[in-house]
């Protein structure tokens, strides 16, 4: 697939608009997430103003999902019972127009995971699929990614955007590819792409404090049959290398995405971009705060903060961003 950037616009995404909607609605999010990070997912959703529920028994899926505003599915610790719960919950969410986020954690590690994801995507239209480059590529090629759930950044920007566009086209949803730079793509008609763009390229400033530079990048891509399609395509940079030293930052991000989308179903692409930007900003803020605290404690012969302290500060940073303590564009 070839992708050509064809337009730039100065129209800006207003981060605070999405944060305000999140605070006002306080969406109830049903998370069927992995057992390694379940507590952190719940806490980061609470930090942003959402209300998490972590039901997992198949017997209560219809009732629980039916009262929720968003469904967050994560295949990180799979089992037959967990996958059955996800199927039931996804069917109910689709029936009631509840947005679904699917996190492809380790999808290429085993045929068990891949078969479930393929069957779910065949049965239910999800609103957002999210994974690192290897995971999204594995789903698109029905293959394996031998790197486990670790992020691999082996493609250049145009390749990553093209992959995101292909996935968005195939599954009729927003595709997020995470990494040092996050990419987000959505299939749209020409009028939407040119008249209603509200998101796109964002980055933190050099200090990592979360100042956003915004603009719009739209693209046209040709598929394998030569047909052309219009896309909204965005890239978000920032964060901090420490985010890779904490397990579950990707799972937390999925919970955050689901919360933002559930709070603004009318602009899901903008909501996804706002969630990605909030997480990148929080990553930089957490590192800055930890470095400052480390200088203080080092002089007193205390243990300097490490990755556990960083995780706590990351959640705190999301709390303060969504509480309006930091001015974001």
Role assignments for model-derived ranges:
Residues 138, 245-277:
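Short, small-residue alpha-helix embedded
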């Amino acid at each position: 697939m070839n992708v050509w950037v064809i337009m730039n616009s100065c129209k800006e995404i207003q981060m605070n608009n999405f944060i305000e909607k999140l605070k006002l609605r306080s969406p109830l999010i049903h998370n069927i997430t992995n057992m390694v990070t379940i507590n952190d997912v719940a806490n980061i959703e609470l930090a942003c103003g959402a209300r998490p529920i972590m039901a997992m028994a198949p017997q209560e899926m219809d009732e629980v999902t039916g009262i929720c505003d968003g469904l967050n599915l994560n295949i990180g610790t799979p089992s037959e019972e967990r996958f059955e719960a996800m199927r039931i919950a996804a069917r109910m969410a689709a029936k009631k127009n509840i947005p679904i986020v699917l996190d492809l954690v380790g999808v290429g590690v085993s045929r068990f995971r891949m078969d479930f994801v393929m069957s779910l995507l065949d049965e239910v239209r999800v609103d957002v699929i999210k994974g690192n480059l290897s995971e999204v590529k594995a789903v698109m090629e029905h293959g394996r990614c031998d790197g486990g759930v670790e992020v691999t950044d082996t493609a250049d920007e145009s390749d990553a955007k093209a992959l995101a566009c292909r996935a968005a086209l195939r599954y009729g949803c927003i595709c997020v590819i995470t990494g040092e730079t996050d990419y987000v793509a959505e299939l749209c008609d020409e009028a939407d792409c040119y008249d209603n763009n509200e998101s796109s390229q964002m980055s933190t400033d050099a200090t990592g404090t979360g100042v956003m530079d915004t603009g719009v990048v739209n693209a046209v891509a040709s598929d394998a049959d030569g047909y052309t399609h219009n896309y909204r395509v965005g890239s978000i940079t920032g964060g901090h290398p420490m985010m890779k030293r904490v397990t579950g930052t990707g799972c937390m991000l999925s919970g955050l995405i689901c919360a933002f989308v559930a709070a603004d179903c009318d602009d899901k692409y903008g909501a996804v971009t706002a969630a990605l930007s909030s997480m990148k900003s929080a990553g930089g803020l957490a590192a800055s705060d930890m470095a400052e605290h480390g200088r203080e404690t080092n002089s007193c012969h205390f243990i300097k903060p490490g990755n556990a302290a960083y995780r706590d500060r990351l959640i705190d940073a999301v709390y303060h961003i969504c509480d309006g303590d930091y001015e974001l564009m």
